[in-house]
UniProtKB/Swiss-Prot annotation:
Signal peptide: none annotated. This is Cellular tumor antigen p53. It comes from Equus caballus (Horse). GO terms for molecular function: DNA-binding transcription factor activity, RNA polymerase II-specific; metal ion binding; molecular condensate scaffold activity; promoter-specific chromatin binding; RNA polymerase II cis-regulatory region sequence-specific DNA binding. The lineage of its organism: Eukaryota, Metazoa, Chordata, Craniata, Vertebrata. Residues 257-268 have a biased composition (Polar residues). The keyword Protein transport does not apply. Multifunctional transcription factor that induces cell cycle arrest, DNA repair or apoptosis upon binding to its target DNA sequence. Acts as a tumor suppressor in many tumor types; induces growth arrest or apoptosis depending on the physiological circumstances and cell type. Negatively regulates cell division by controlling expression of a set of genes required for this process. One of the activated genes is an inhibitor of cyclin-dependent kinases. Apoptosis induction seems to be mediated either by stimulation of BAX and FAS antigen expression, or by repression of Bcl-2 expression.
Length: 280
C-alpha cells in the first residue's frame, strides 16, 4: 500500500482513507481576495488665505496682455481676475514691489479649490497625467500641478501637516531697466481631467515670504487649464457682462399709452484702450 500511495496524489490518498459514511473532503478553495481600496488622499484641515495683502513692500502681480486670439496659449482676464492657459504651456507672472524685500525672500505658488465645499481637498494632477510624467519633469514630483519653468533653484514641497503641494523659488530683484520680476509657471493638468480637478475651479495663491517663512505679501488669481484659452476667456467674459447688465423692464400691459420717441438710451461710452500689461 505504501508503494501504491507513492503513485497517487495526496488528495486521492486522503479520499481512499475516508470511511464509507464520511463525505469526501475536497481541497479547500482559497478565500477570494478582497478588492484593494481605492486610493484616497487625506483632506487638509488647513485652508490658506486668498485675501490680497500687499504688505510693507507693496506686493502685487502683473500679466501680459495676450488678447483672445485662437492662437494664444495663455491669456489673462482682468475682468475676471482669471488666467486661461493650455496644459504645460508657459504662463508668465510678473511680481512687482514698491521697495526691495529683505535678502533671502522667497516666492511660493500653491493651488487650492475655489469653492468652499472642496477647499479641504488637495489640488493634484489626475492619475493619467501622473503616469505620463517623464524625465523632462526634472525636479518636480509627478503629482504636483504647478511647475516653475527654467529655474533649477525651484523647490517642490509636500507639507507633512497640511498635505498641500507648493513650489518655492528665491525672489530675484528686477533686472536693470525693468520694474518687475517674471516667473514662468506651467500647469500640468487640464481643468476637465477626471480624477483630478474634474471641472472644479482653482485659485493659485502667490505669496512673498522671508527666509523664515513669514508672510510679506499675498495675491491670487483663478486658473483654467483648457484647450482654447482665447475662446474660453471670451465666453466667460461675455457671460459675466450679461449677468452684470440690469434686466429690462417688462412692457406695460396697456397699449393705449404711447411712449415718447425721445426715451432712447444714451449710446454706450467707448472703452479706453488697454495697456500692454494688467496688474492686480
Amino acid at each position: 500500500p505504501a508503494v501504491n500511495n507513492l503513485l497517487l496524489s495526496p488528495d486521492v490518498v486522503n479520499w481512499l482513507d475516508e470511511g464509507p459514511d464520511e463525505a469526501p473532503r475536497m481541497p479547500a478553495a482559497p478565500a477570494p481576495l478582497a478588492p484593494a481600496p481605492a486610493t484616497s488622499w487625506p483632506l487638509s484641515s488647513f485652508v490658506p488665505s486668498q485675501k490680497t495683502y500687499p504688505g510693507c513692500y507693496g506686493f502685487r502681480l502683473g500679466f501680459l496682455n495676450s488678447g483672445t486670439a485662437k492662437s494664444v496659449t495663455c491669456t489673462y482676464s482682468p475682468t475676471l481676475n482669471k488666467l486661461f492657459c493650455q496644459l504645460a504651456k508657459t504662463c508668465p507672472v510678473q511680481l512687482l514691489v514698491s521697495s526691495p524685500p529683505p535678502p533671502g525672500t522667497r516666492v511660493r505658488a500653491m493651488a487650492i479649490y475655489k469653492k468652499s465645499e472642496f477647499m479641504t481637498e488637495v489640488v493634484r494632477r489626475c492619475p493619467h497625467h501622473e503616469r505620463c510624467s517623464d524625465s523632462s519633469d526634472g525636479l518636480a514630483p509627478p503629482q504636483h500641478l504647478i511647475r516653475v519653468e527654467g529655474n533649477l533653484r525651484a523647490e517642490y514641497l509636500d507639507d507633512r501637516n497640511t498635505f498641500r503641494h507648493s513650489v518655492v523659488v528665491p525672489y530675484e530683484p528686477p533686472e536693470v531697466g525693468s520694474d518687475c520680476t517674471t516667473i514662468h509657471y506651467n500647469f500640468m493638468c487640464n481643468s476637465s481631467c477626471m480624477g483630478g480637478m474634474n471641472r472644479r475651479p482653482i485659485l493659485t495663491i502667490i505669496t512673498l515670504e522671508d527666509s523664515s517663512g513669514n508672510l510679506l505679501g499675498r495675491n491670487s488669481f483663478e486658473v483654467r487649464v483648457c484647450a482654447c484659452p482665447g475662446r474660453d476667456r471670451r465666453t466667460e467674459e461675455e457671460n459675466f457682462r450679461k449677468k452684470e447688465e440690469p434686466c429690462p423692464e417688462p412692457p406695460p400691459r396697456s397699449t393705449k399709452r404711447v411712449l415718447s420717441s425721445n426715451t432712447s438710451s444714451s449710446p454706450p461710452q467707448k472703452k479706453k484702450p488697454l495697456d500692454g500689461e494688467y496688474f492686480t
